[in-house]
Amino acid sequence: METNKPFLTVENITVRLRDQLFLKNSFWQIRSDQHWAILGPNGSGKSTLVRSLWGGVPLQSGRIVYDFASHQMEPQLIPQKDEIGYVSFELQQSLMEHEAFQEDLREYAGRTEEVTTARDVIFSGILANRTITPADEERFLKVVDHLGIQYLLQKSIGSLSTGEVRKTLIARALIKSPRLLILDEPFDGLDERSRATLAESINRLMTGPMRVILVVHRLEEIVLNITHVLLVKEGQLFMQGPKDEILTSENISRLYGFNLHLERTNRGFRVSYGSEKSDKIDTSVVYEESLQDVPEVLIEMKDTTVQYDDLIVLDRLNWSMRRGENWAILGTNGSGKSTIVKLILGDNLQGYANQVMLFGKRKGSGEILWEIKRHIGAVSSELQVQHRKKMSAYDVITSGFYDSIGLYRYPTPKQKKIVDGWIELLKIGDISNQPYHQLSYGQKRMILLARAMVKSPPLLIMDEPCHGLDISNRRRILRIIEMIGGTPTQLLYVTNHRDEIPNCITHVMRLHKGKVLSQGRKEDIL
């Protein structure tokens, strides 16, 4: 490849999303010796920009010139699908929704033994256009080895963790040997080891002819071989240029609107903003009722095992969460963290075949599911996927009083006051009246936290709560979690990031391949 010639040029584009214009008259050029990272706050337009590159959103004006295209074409046309690989949370969400629909069809047709495997998903991009060739099989083996995902090829896609599905989709994009690979938040949902492995894989990919665009929220995830950085703010291209010129404390502070310190390390960058004292929450404003009736033991699991055929997801788990304790669960992808959450929430039916006690009642003993859920607030990627109804963010928050997907009754004046209180605490008033489905991933996460808390739950489950959040919203949500830690609500906090464990956490459980490595008081485990 001839170095330093144009690879892709965004010429004065403007994008219309619903009734708003974004990226007005934006110009951006990628040259053939460059790899770019894109940074910006939640809802700033990062994903809109990269979606425009493959035709995911239409252009209002301007054009995109695909200098890398393998065939001559008109500038306004999109290259062949094989030439651009794209991975994002929205793509992952679409895949899981499609698989859930397929599972319903199989159950209706009595074909419950059929599954969609990770291998099927990886090859699906090719099968959409043509049959598989020996060259495809050879490339498949190389990609799978490159990403280290041999172990999950025959697993059902529905049984994989968020991080495992993400790696499967990256393999799906790579098997087509694209000229341009767009990775929108590829590290979200991955454990520490998987993040390091994927970063190494992306760095190796950058040594070949393929160019990479990496959209990230965490500066630590900008891999070493990135050469240039584009900053996006409030729907506009804010700053762009060589990595070392753009990534300074001053520029990043201007991007996010508060003082940040950027430090260079041998692995890239680290950003810090100092510690903050968390205020106390006025429970008289945002709590609907007293939590005096909470039993001594909130959760208890005895010899709990979850198994799919020969795959053991949880292996004889013994664990309890008592009154006054706030727990964090750590573990690698596929270790069983999310399975524990699903057992508690009633989303995994194997809970009824095990000794799982919630608030003093054993699952399967005649308890009413909605009565149990009334005591639990939850924030997770799975819950975020379920909210597909077109409704305002305010109504999504209000639906938390009724544990419903959708709002089917009018809230009382007292309930409205509580909703308004959480909106004020989370500082989400600017998005609370917007259509929920039009919000960015990170903005939706903030709405779901408010939804989880409005019913004053004795237990709040947070499965990767910082997933998809920029540094400003991560700081805000961690501060709010610390504040919640000082209320009657107890926390079950699931994360892949040890550095995001709040100070209010009192106990930690570490999992590996479905087994408990250690559990106990935080100071003894970490």
Where are these regions (language model features)?
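ABC ATPase nucleotide-binding domain signature region
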Residues: V50-L127, K342-I405
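Conserved ABC ATPase "signature" region
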Residues: F123, A135-L152, T398, P413-I431
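Conserved ABC ATPase signature
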Residues: S156-L160, P435-L439
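Hydrophobic anchor residue at the start of the ABC signature
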Residues: I170, L449
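Catalytic Walker B motif of ABC-type/P-loop ATPase nucleotide-binding domains
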Residues: L181-E185, L460-E464
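H-loop/switch region of ABC-family ATPase nucleotide-binding domains
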Residues: V216-H217, T495-N496
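H-loop (His-switch) and adjacent beta-strand-loop-beta switch element
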Residues: T227-P242, I505-R521
